[in-house]
Each structure stands twice: as C-alpha cells, then as structure tokens.
C-alpha cells in the first residue's frame, strides 16, 4: 500500500485576498523597488568610492543643515501645531472655517509658489523683511529662510493629527481637574497631553519627513550656498545637473538611510507613548 500525502487544494498565495495581493503589488512597484534600486545603484560602486562621495565636506555640511533644520521645524510645529489645534477645537470665532481651511494651504500650494511667496514677504525689500532688515536680521537667502520654508510646508501635519484627538477628549475631565485645584499647566500636562501625545509624535514624524525631502520652496528662498544654507536635496539636484549620477545616488542613499533611522526612533517613541498611556 502506498502512502499519499494530502494535496493542498489551494496554495498559500491563492488563499490570500485580492485586496492583500493588490496592496503588496502596488507598494512593491511604487515604493519598495525604487528604494531598493537606489541602494543597489549605490552598492554597485566600490566601497571606497561610496565613502568618498558620502563624506565629501560639502555633502556632510548639507546633511547637517538638512537634518538639523528639519528637526527644528518639526519641533516648532509640534508646539505650535498643538496650540493651533487647541484653538480650532475649543473656541468659536468669526471666520473660523476660513481659518481652518487655510491650515491645509501648504498641501495644495505648489512648493515653488510657496518659496516665491515666502521670498516676496521675507526678503530685504519684502513686506515683512523691509522692517527687520534695518536691525541686521535677514531671513530670505539664509538658514532662517530654509527653516521658515520647512515650517510652512510641514505645519498641517501636527494640526490635522492632533485635532481629532482633542475633539475626542471630554471637557468634563478638564473641568474635574480644575475643580480639584489643578492649575491650567497641570491640567495640560496630566490630563490633556498624555492621550494626544501619540498623535503629536505622529504629526512630528510626518512633518520631519516632509521637511527633509523639501526642494521647491527651499531652492527659491535660500541662497543655496555650500557650507551655509545648502540642503541635501538641492545638492542632489546640482550633482544631476553636473551628470554626477554616482554622487547623486550616494547622497540620496545616505539621506534616505538617516531619514529611516530617525523615523524609526520617532515611531518607537510613539509606540511607547501609546502603551504607556493605554
């Protein structure tokens, strides 16, 4: 008598739903393959050449400007985004809907137009720049201009992630804390912040990612000077203009790698906050 192993009527792949398969095919074509291709292109170069291109002084300076200002912009929006979300959810005032719609303007506005607008307002002869220039303060075509552009394009992320969380909070909890003698600052730190902290960190992470990759607005409002306000995305574009595809690929890989590491850290903090408050 011969033994027959039971045959599988369906393979593992056929048991998967079409939505699952479509999701993975879509992500593979749009996200995974381009990222892997970038790393493979860099890995095709000799290791010494990769190190040389990645650690050029101008590239290192561009990394510092890019990540330093992106983190600063994300932190600023983390603070002011919460304040704006608080105002939108806790107060009624004339023109509130119009004010709320303006928050999403950086999403819809082309980045080049955003850069042109900021340069028009904050240049030495701009609407605001002309009043601060006599005091020796220059925003446009400096690192301050880069920071301003990054703050502008990443502002909506924190506001839109925190706003629904604030709407879910019960006002009675805040009133109870106040009735028990808690000060407004104590109420914020102990009652309001813990449940919205994961949303704040999520918005900060999204805003940081957006700021790191920003090009259109920064290239207009900054001076794009090496070792001063030149950011990595603009440096990559300059390398491509010089037909230095190897340099552009390596710098892009470094930028992507460091961004992934920082996002991993922020997401880890977000998960920790969710478990701590859950």
UniProtKB/Swiss-Prot annotation:
Residues 63-266 form the ABC transmembrane type-1 domain. Coiled coil: none annotated. Keywords: Cell inner membrane, Cell membrane, Membrane, Stress response, Sulfate transport, Transmembrane, Transmembrane helix, Transport. Induction: By sulfur deprivation. Its main location: membrane. Pfam families: BPD_transp_1. It is found in: Cell inner membrane. The keyword ATP-binding does not apply. PROSITE patterns: ABC_TM1 (PS50928). It is a multi-pass membrane protein. It comes from the Bacteria. SUPFAM superfamilies: MetI-like. GO terms for molecular function: ABC-type sulfate transporter activity. One of its GO terms (cellular component) is plasma membrane. Belongs to the binding-protein-dependent transport system permease family. CysTW subfamily. PANTHER family: SULFATE TRANSPORT SYSTEM PERMEASE PROTEIN (PTHR30406), SULFATE TRANSPORT SYSTEM PERMEASE PROTEIN CYST (PTHR30406:SF8). Part of the ABC transporter complex CysAWTP (TC 3.A.1.6.1) involved in sulfate/thiosulfate import. Probably responsible for the translocation of the substrate across the membrane. The complex is composed of two ATP-binding proteins (CysA), two transmembrane proteins (CysT and CysW) and a solute-binding protein (CysP). This is Sulfate transport system permease protein CysT. It comes from Synechococcus elongatus (strain ATCC 33912 / PCC 7942 / FACHB-805) (Anacystis nidulans R2). The lineage of its organism: Bacteria, Bacillati, Cyanobacteriota, Cyanophyceae, Synechococcales.
């Amino acid at each position: 008598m011969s033994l027959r192993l039971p045959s599988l009527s369906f393979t593992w792949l056929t048991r998967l739903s079409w939505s699952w398969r479509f999701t993975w095919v879509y992500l593979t074509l749009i996200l995974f393959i381009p990222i892997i291709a970038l790393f493979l292109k860099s890995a095709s170069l000799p290791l010494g050449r990769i190190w040389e291109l990645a650690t050029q002084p101008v590239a290192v300076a561009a990394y510092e400007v890019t990540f330093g200002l992106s983190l600063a912009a994300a932190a600023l929006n983390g603070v002011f985004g919460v304040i704006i979300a608080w105002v939108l959810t806790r107060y009624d005032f004339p023109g509130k809907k119009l004010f709320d719609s303006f928050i999403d303007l950086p999403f819809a506005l082309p980045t080049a137009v955003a850069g042109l607008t900021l340069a028009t307002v904050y240049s030495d002869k701009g609407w605001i720049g002309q009043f601060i220039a006599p005091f020796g303060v220059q925003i446009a075509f400096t690192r301050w201009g880069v920071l301003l552009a990054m703050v502008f394009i990443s502002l909506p992320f924190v506001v839109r992630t925190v706003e629904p969380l604030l709407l879910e909070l019960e006002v009675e909890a805040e009133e109870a804390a106040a009735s028990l003698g808690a000060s407004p600052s104590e109420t914020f730190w102990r009652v309001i912040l813990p449940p919205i902290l994961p949303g704040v960190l999520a918005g900060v992470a999204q805003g940081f990612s957006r700021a790191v990759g920003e090009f259109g607005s920064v290239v207009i409002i900054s001076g794009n000077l090496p070792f001063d306000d030149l950011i990595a995305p603009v440096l990559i574009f300059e390398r491509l203009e010089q037909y230095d595809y190897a340099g552009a690929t390596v710098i892009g890989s470094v930028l992507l790698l460091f961004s992934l590491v920082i996002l991993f850290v922020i997401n880890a903090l977000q998960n920790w906050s969710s478990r701590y408050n859950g």
